[in-house]
């Protein structure tokens, strides 16, 4: 089994959830660029991490060449030889082109770019219902993953909070930005003939089954 996948979709589409489930089924690693960046800036002796941390602390966007270098480093690790599921990258056409070149140099190519389509109102409903425990960081959803007691963490019994990012006005803004920024990447993969669209509202099991069909596997 080999597959080189990119997951695209708005915030709240469930990309990370689907990628983790597919990793469990296939053994192909879920590579979250958000996780990579959080890890790299914590490393005191990593020059690349120091550069990125300085840029982020200034509130600036990390340039493509540094993002590409971080991703290249991770994809060059042994566990990615049979494939990967990229979540959070590429965000620009330049990054998509870099990924193509990186794979081409290894005589590989992207299997598919999977676009999880979720309407704005569903994203708003999902994300505004998200709550987090301020003590342990556990994430809940008042609709799909509620705590046992009303708005209290199951573990800490502390009142759950809503992140600023998950307030309706912010969620709608993030969705708009996603459409503007990601459309060129969607168009890029569409022109290459490897864009696969999946309805992100049909439930986790059905979504996973659709992705397994796309890569030519069946969930047995």
Curated annotation (Swiss-Prot):
LID: region residues: 129-166
Amino acids binding ATP: 12-17, 130, 139-140, 202
Subcellular localization, as worded in the UniProt entry: Cytoplasm
The keyword Transferase is assigned to this record: yes
Pathway listed: Purine metabolism; AMP biosynthesis via salvage pathway; AMP from ADP: step 1/1
Keywords from the UniProt entry: ATP-binding, Cytoplasm, Kinase, Metal-binding, Nucleotide biosynthesis, Nucleotide-binding, Transferase, Zinc
InterPro entries assigned to the protein according to its UniProt record, in alphabetical order: Adenyl_kin_sub, Adenylat/UMP-CMP_kin, Adenylat_kinase_CS, Adenylate_kinase_lid-dom, P-loop_NTPase
EC annotation from Swiss-Prot or TrEMBL: 2.7.4.3
Catalytic activity field: AMP + ATP = 2 ADP
Keyword Protein biosynthesis among record annotations: no
Major location category of this protein: cytoplasm
SUPFAM superfamilies per the UniProt record, alphabetical: P-loop containing nucleoside triphosphate hydrolases
Binding site for Zn(2+): 133, 136, 153, 156
Cellular-component GO terms for this entry: cytoplasm
Domains: entry comment: Consists of three domains, a large central CORE domain and two small peripheral domains, NMPbind and LID, which undergo movements during catalysis. The LID domain closes over the site of phosphoryl transfer upon ATP binding. Assembling and dissambling the active center during each catalytic cycle provides an effective means to prevent ATP hydrolysis. Some bacteria have evolved a zinc-coordinating structure that stabilizes the LID domain.
Family: Belongs to the adenylate kinase family.
HAMAP family with a match to the protein in the record: Adenylate_kinase_Adk (MF_00235)
Function: Catalyzes the reversible transfer of the terminal phosphate group between ATP and AMP. Plays an important role in cellular energy homeostasis and in adenine nucleotide metabolism.
Name of the featured protein: Adenylate kinase
Protein's organism: Thermotoga petrophila (strain ATCC BAA-488 / DSM 13995 / JCM 10881 / RKU-1)
Lineage, broadest ranks: Bacteria, Thermotogati, Thermotogota, Thermotogae, Thermotogales
């Amino acid at each position: 089994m080999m597959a080189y996948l990119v997951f695209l979709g708005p915030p709240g589409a469930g990309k990370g959830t689907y990628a983790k489930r597919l990793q469990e089924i296939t053994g192909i690693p879920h590579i979250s660029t958000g996780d990579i960046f959080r890890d790299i800036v914590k490393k005191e002796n990593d020059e690349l991490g120091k550069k990125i941390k300085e840029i982020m602390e200034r509130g600036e966007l990390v340039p493509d060449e540094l993002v590409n270098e971080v991703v290249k480093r991770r994809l060059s690790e042994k566990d990615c030889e049979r494939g990967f599921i990229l979540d959070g990258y590429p965000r620009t056409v330049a990054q998509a082109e870099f990924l193509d070149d990186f794979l081409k140099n290894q005589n590989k190519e992207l299997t598919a770019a999977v676009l999880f389509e979720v309407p704005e109102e569903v994203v708003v409903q999902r994300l505004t219902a998200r709550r987090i425990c301020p003590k342990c960081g556990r994430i809940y959803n008042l609709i799909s993953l509620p705590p046992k007691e009303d708005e209290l963490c199951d573990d800490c019994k502390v009142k759950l909070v809503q992140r600023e990012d998950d307030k309706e006005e912010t969620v709608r803004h993030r969705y708009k930005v996603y459409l503007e920024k990601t459309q060129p990447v969607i168009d890029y993969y569409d022109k290459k003939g490897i864009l696969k669209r999946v309805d992100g509202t049909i439930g986790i099991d059905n979504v996973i089954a659709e992705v397994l069909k796309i890569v030519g596997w069946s969930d047995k």
